[in-house]
Amino acid sequence: TKDVDVEKVRALAPDLVLANQEENARPAIESLIAAGVPVHVSFPRTVPEALAYLGSLATLLGVEEPAIARRAFARHAVIERTPRRVFVPIWRDPWMTFDENAFASDLLALVGAQNVFADRPRRYPLAADLGKRAAMTGARVAGRDTRYPRIQLQEVVERAPDLVLLPDEPYAFGPADRDVLAELLPEAEVRLTDGKDLFWYGARLATSIDALAEAVDRRSRPA
């Protein structure tokens, strides 16, 4: 949960708290640390950073680092592929996606997919993100998160993806959304996919790498 009840956590006297810089509120994490609670904060933006996180977590827990994720990374990193141009929305109303600085973008690149919005940062304010006014610049946007642009469907058409992956989280895309995008992009393959394969960077990373590689592979098109 983003909003941690600090007092309830302290009452549990945990040996270790696993937190994420993006998912958990900073004041709560700082309060736990100030109270002497051991906190391990993660924020991987690339697959190598996720692998490093798994290694550091194994060290903290006093267990052997699982090698399966590193093997999956090494196996796919050496495969030469012609990249597929992929669009992955993460929200609707407004439509949102991610740029090259998000973990999912690096994961997709590993398995042979080029994020068509890699070079499209989020612009402020909302009207600028939607192309209705000039974007704020300089100190006015310093420190703001620009990884998740809000986009219009016309932008998707213009960037011409040949593959669309519709995850079931954080927004639960379904068959109706698939139909909308299939009509919008008649030349593209549109697939529903498990959001955990795109956005979860923990112990399931090896499974995610292989599952995404199969989703991106042209030879694995559903009948």
Regions found by a protein language model. Name each.
Residues 61, 216-220:
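Short, hydrophobic alpha-helical segments
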Residues 54-62:
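Helix-loop "lid/cap" segments that line or gate small-molecule binding pockets
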Residues 1-48, 67-206, 222-223:
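Binding-cleft/active-site segments that stabilize strongly anionic ligands or cofactors
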